[in-house]
């Protein structure tokens, strides 16, 4: 049986927002944690320059790849404790890794998979629970539209929040 949740965890012990669950449901998808794939020096690859000004050794906290036939949608998620800034390099680096993996798949296996869309999401907060409305109502969050690495969809969430994937895909 396929899992229906993706656990997104922040590895920094000082972070206020430590984990969020994405409720994905069934379907043709998988998730990966690019932070855990880097070496002991936190590099994506020893072949890449590690000088100041290079963002390619950064990684977001989670990627979810959703397959629709031969078209792929990738949701890139990063958790931030407070002010949601400084995430573009993390998204760019992880996006480049996905492109590299697809290139290898095409080169060595003739795979017809194509990256149709990337969606960039920053979930931030974690310090305290969101306020409860005084009257019973369904909380309305903004919906995610088209995003870019430097213009991600942002949503404040408490620790251990459950967020539906479809809300983040727009």
Residue ranges of each PLM-predicted region?
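Conserved catalytic cores of phosphodiester-cleaving nucleases, focusing on short active-site segments
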Residues: 62-64, 73-81
